[in-house]
Regions:
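Beta/alpha (TIM)-barrel catalytic core signal, keyed to glycine-rich beta->alpha loops juxtaposed to Asp/Glu
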Residues: 1-155
């Protein structure tokens, strides 16, 4: 990333965002130093796959729906929905409920609370799904207790 920034500056086309996979489930950007580097260099982050390909929605709470990407083997493999992951999804869903949000809304809000995240890329397949996802912007404030609960759920 650092070298790409140098090249683009030389070309007078500065990079201003870094697009990375980022979600409650996938926080590699926090551990590999890229997020810190972006902050130090004034670069925003665009999060893609913010709902972990649908895992961070209510879609898989009761198993694998027949019409889902997972059932069709497209993008998301059945192996991704382990008993441990399903349990985490269910507990996260409970936290979302206490916030008056769906799991998807809370998962998006969790990203949008971060001033470094300039945008999230969502893959809504209907207008209704898009409208539901946009509700995440109505409550992006998290208490320290909520953030700690989420952290503990993910670290189990």
């Amino acid at each position: 990333t650092a070298r790409a920034v140098e090249i683009m500056k030389e070309l007078r086309c500065p990079l201003i965002v870094n697009q990375r996979r980022y979600s409650i489930f996938d926080r590699a950007i926090e551990q590999d130093g890229v997020k810190a580097w972006c902050r130090e260099n004034g670069m925003g982050i665009i999060a893609f796959s913010p709902l972990a390909q649908g895992l961070l929605t209510n879609r898989y709470l009761n198993g694998i729906p027949e019409d889902s990407r997972m059932a069709k083997g497209a993008f998301l493999k059945k192996e991704a929905l382990t008993d441990e992951t399903l349990q985490k999804i269910k507990v996260l869903n409970e936290v979302a409920g206490t916030r008056g949000q769906t799991l998807a809304e809370m998962s998006l809000a969790w990203l949008l609370k971060d001033d470094l995240v300039t945008s999230v890329i969502i893959g809504a397949s209907s207008v209704a799904q898009l409208a539901d996802n946009l509700k995440a912007t109505e409550n992006t404030d998290f208490s320290a207790e909520e953030l700690e609960k989420i952290k503990k759920i993910i670290q189990k």
